Amino acid sequence: MRTYILLLFTLFTLETAAQSFNDLCRKGIENIKDYEFQKAIANFEKAEVASTSKHEKIYCLVNIAYSRQMLGDLHGALKSYNKALDINNKELTLIQQRANIYLQLDSVEKALADYNTILKEEESNTGALLCRAHIYTNIGKYKEAWNDYAMLERWLPDNISVQLGIAVLYQKEKKYTECMEMLDNLIKKNPDIPELYLARSNVEREQGYNELALMDINKAIELDPQNASNYLLQAIIYDKMGKKSAAKKSREKARLLGKDSNLLNF
């Protein structure tokens, strides 16, 4: 009789734990749908404690990482992804998510190491390849960047992000004619994408064509008026043109949108 009672108690405990896990996860998902990320973290942390398998624990940690990322807590998100990878360090999706966080935190070498790991296993992972090409461009490994973009053009011949990346690579190499030809063509085909005007403005500013740069940054602001960084770039152009009052107004607009002018270095 005692053995039978213990068996019933064990089964009841397992069933209750399973239901608790499922209920907590369901609540967490609803929290995410409602943009209640702090509540989502709390529910998934409880679900992690109630989890009974590695798969369940990873599921909780990924949702915690996502919620922290949405709250702007990149270091917290990184911590959760690392915990998940401690459980399964072969999961490429987790490695890619971690690499993306590293990239946002400017931990370039760590991001590059993760993207290399992914691409050794999945040569055709275009997301990882594009990010690696971006890193190579920024750290001055132009030959490696061209190799990555050559593969990306083969797999994604009309992708705007790929074409924009190539234009930036031309800019880094001071090949302004090729760069401007690409950007002009991209803008002609996609006149409503603010990032393209921003990119062309940067090239024009770099060459000293401040009036053209101002026209393009103004267009980028027109298309995306809530992007605070564009107002800071506008202020820099105004400064170069000697328009101090206009520059001050642009910086104030950026500040009101939540961007500290001291955070960016152009």
Please state what every model-predicted region is.
Residues 59-63, 70, 97, 131, ...:
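Canonical tetratricopeptide repeat
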Residues 33-34, 67-70, 104-105, 138-139, ...:
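Register position in tetratricopeptide repeats
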Residues 46-52, 83-86, 117-120, 150-154, ...:
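Conserved structural position within tetratricopeptide repeats
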Residues 21-22, 54-58, 92-93, 126-127, ...:
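Helix-start (N-cap) detector for alpha-helical repeat units in TPR-like alpha-solenoids
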Residues 16-63, 70, 266:
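N-terminal leader/linker segments that initiate helical-solenoid repeat arrays
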Residues 232-266:
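Terminal, low-structured helical/coil segments at or just beyond the last alpha-helical repeat
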